[in-house]
Amino acid sequence: MGSEATTAVNNLQQPLLESTKSEADFRMESVLTDTHLSYFRRIYLASLIEMKYLFHLAAPAIFVYVINNGMSMLTRIFAGRLGSMQLAAASLGNSGFNMFTLGLMLGMGSAVETLCGQAHGAHRYDMLGVYLQRSTIVLVITGLPMTLLFIFSKPLLISLGEPADVASVASVFVYGMIPMIFAYAVNFPIQKFLQSQSIVTPSAYISAATLVIHLILSWLSVFKFGWGLLGLSVVHSLSWWIIVLAQIIYIKISPRCRRTWDGFSWKAFDGLWDFFQLSAASAVMLCLESWYSQILVLLAGLLKDPELALDSLAICMSISAMSFMVSVGFNAAASVRVSNELGAGNPRSAAFSTAVTTGVSFLLSLFEAIVILSWRHVISYIFTDSPAVAEAVAELSPFLAITIVLNGVQPVLSGVAVGCGWQAYVAYVNIGCYYIVGIPIGYVLGFTYDMGARGIWTGMIGGTLMQTIILVIVTFRTDWDKEVEKASRRLDQWEDTSPLLKQ
């Protein structure tokens, strides 16, 4: 008994993410199945292993998402220097067209997250490059019709009720973002390709360096060359292409990608329709989640005192978005860990990783919620000097705290769903919970019962809570041995280019 415990402890001291095949894949599984160790000893040792994996993956992922949001924020700041009209146009372009494109492309890119993660865990390294290329092809094709939305942005905005002068200026900004569509189409498959191999730190360095370049180029565009709003949006697109090219160079020269990138392959053109179906399910799952909070703001604009409601909700949504960045990092970590362990044939490790990641994210979100409630009367003064808005934010703080706690669990479970390949199922759950339950209840409470923003938010919290409970139950009842079998069968079918979805 003592020798097995000593071996388990010694295993913890080995380099975690650069181990040999057997060490990296079966270390935690061997600990969890070691009957010579007591139950609590197994949990303790496995937790140490998982925490190392978790924070190695989550911390850089959080940093990357924060930096990428920082680029959009800098663009809006420089647009504000051009004038209030330009700021409104840039905000409209970013929150409308850019966020729609970002959500769609990021969602479709998560399909490669499932396949690359499971293939890497199963040591089918040659297929990772094929999945990367296949996803890129699908996303580039998807980007072509989206380009038409950007080209005809002016009449589209006018038809949606925007003033003609705002629509005209916004369309100029949107034109400069067209290259960004295809930067997204290449970037997100690359990002998931690297994450599935636990290669996350290089992307963080690249994003940080690009943020500095973006700042310099934006300043030159506005103050040195006078290129105006179009110049700012072109710089934003260029910054994303810098990220893409830097990651491509890294893949080409890094020894860590030699097994997974063999160059371009004609296999990438096989099974594109089935790959598109999986990508579309992933996109629907993510878009339904990201659009949900936007609908809360839209409904608030229909209230009797929309200005106060929108101001207070904007502050709450900004705080929620900052907190959500942490959850997104754990979402990425959960997806990678679960898909890797399923691909490697480790059902207990996949289940344990799910429990640890969810628990850590929940505890962090609970701490954030307590801080929000403690500072609810003063936190709004970071954004505004208005006492009326501060009071409204204080009234909404309990709803914000509940949302933050739910966001500590729900994105992690969505990451587990991506790791398992459940995107289509979660998309149906999202439709039912968010759009059939949450929004109608919020509308009735907010308008029929005159509860205002609190009523709308109560209904939408109800939808999120229902979705979270369903995902918790589904995850808790998961037969992880069967998920390992499904992962193996999925990889066999994709490698043979037979339909993935006919399982």
From Swiss-Prot:
It is a multi-pass membrane protein. The chain crosses the membrane at residues 54-74, 87-107, 137-157, 166-186, 203-223, 225-245, 271-293, 313-333, 355-375, 399-419, 427-447, 456-476. CDD domains: MATE_eukaryotic. The keyword Membrane applies. One of its GO terms (cellular component) is membrane. It is found in: Membrane. GO terms for molecular function: antiporter activity; xenobiotic transmembrane transporter activity. Its main location: membrane. One of its GO terms (biological process) is xenobiotic detoxification by transmembrane export across the plasma membrane. NCBIfam families: matE. Belongs to the multi antimicrobial extrusion (MATE) (TC 2.A.66.1) family. This is Protein DETOXIFICATION 36. It comes from Arabidopsis thaliana (Mouse-ear cress).
